[in-house]
A protein has these predicted regions:
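N-terminal active-site segment of His-dependent metallophosphoesterases
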Residues: 1-52, 123-125
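Short amphipathic alpha-helical segments and helix-helix/interface helices
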Residues: 20, 43-51, 69-73, 120-121, ...
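Binuclear metal-dependent phosphoesterase catalytic core
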Residues: 86-90, 155-161, 174-215
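Active-site-proximal beta-strand elements of phosphoester/diester hydrolases
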Residues: 1-10, 91-100, 129-133, 184-189, ...
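Conserved catalytic scaffold of divalent metal-dependent phosphoesterases
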Residues: 58, 65-153
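Short, hinge-like loop/turn segments at secondary-structure boundaries
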Residues: 50, 75-79, 148, 184, ...
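Active-site environment of divalent metal-dependent phosphoester hydrolases
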Residues: 10-15, 38-42, 63-70, 102-105, ...
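Active-site neighborhood of phospho(di)ester-bond hydrolases with catalytic His/Asp-centered motifs
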Residues: 5-8, 31-36, 57-63, 81-83, ...
């Protein structure tokens, strides 16, 4: 399975076109959008464009996505909202949590509350590809090169559940890949010049370590 992960499209035509080109160039089996797919208006237009790509698109809501993100996603045959659910593609389990950290950026939705984290732990296992919007605290979360703006709640969740991979965005200027224990964390924001991340899994040997790269 080839996964193409992006975040922070913000409904910008140029970034939608960048994703379209990425799908054409890399021929992924699934597109992951790790939040801020839309902006502060109706996400229908960007979802419509992504739906036309002809591959499954799994998505979570970020801080600039409207509260009706999940409802709008249901209108499109190729779009799946991952919020608080597990979804398998080619046998590989995905799970997601919508929302973002409350500080230092203002946002209309935060998922890092104790009860939500407890519920999320129930859908995350060691093979899970977890899709969230913010990075964990201290990992790929630097703003202006010095301020950590990630989530401490997510960091604790990763330590407790040890998912296989975390795909995130939110911090535009700190894209990359890093390990948190046994978990590979990828900040796949495309808000600057990047195309996101490509991750290749072995269908014949699902337990084999995936090959990931930024593009």
């Amino acid at each position: 399975m080839r996964l193409y992960a992006v975040a922070d499209i913000h409904a910008k035509p140029g970034l939608i076109e960048r994703v379209r080109k990425g799908v054409a160039d890399y021929a992924p089996d699934v597109l992951v959008t790790a939040g801020d797919t839309g902006n502060y208006v109706n996400p229908g237009r960007v979802f419509g464009c992504l739906n036309e790509l002809g591959i499954p698109v799994v998505s979570v809501r970020g801080n600039t996505d409207r509260l009706w993100h999940e409802r709008v996603a249901r209108r499109y045959s190729n779009i799946v909202s991952l919020h608080m659910k597990e979804y398998k593609i080619k046998g590989f389990p995905f799970a997601g949590i919508s929302g973002t950290v409350p500080v230092p950026f203002r946002s209309r939705f935060s998922f890092f509350e104790t009860d939500m984290l407890k519920k999320a732990a129930g859908i995350i296992g060691p093979e899970t590809i977890l899709v969230v919007h913010p990075p964990p605290y201290g990992t790929l979360d630097r703003v202006a090169g010095r301020l950590s703006a990630g989530s401490k709640g997510l960091k604790r969740l990763i330590a407790g559940c040890r998912p296989r991979m975390v795909l995130c965005g939110h911090i535009h200027e700190d894209t990359g890949m890093a390990a948190v224990g046994d978990t590979l964390v990828i900040n796949c924001s495309i808000a600057d010049a990047q195309y996101g991340a490509i991750v290749d899994f072995d269908d014949q040997d699902p337990g084999r370590a995936p090959v990931a790269r930024l593009v």
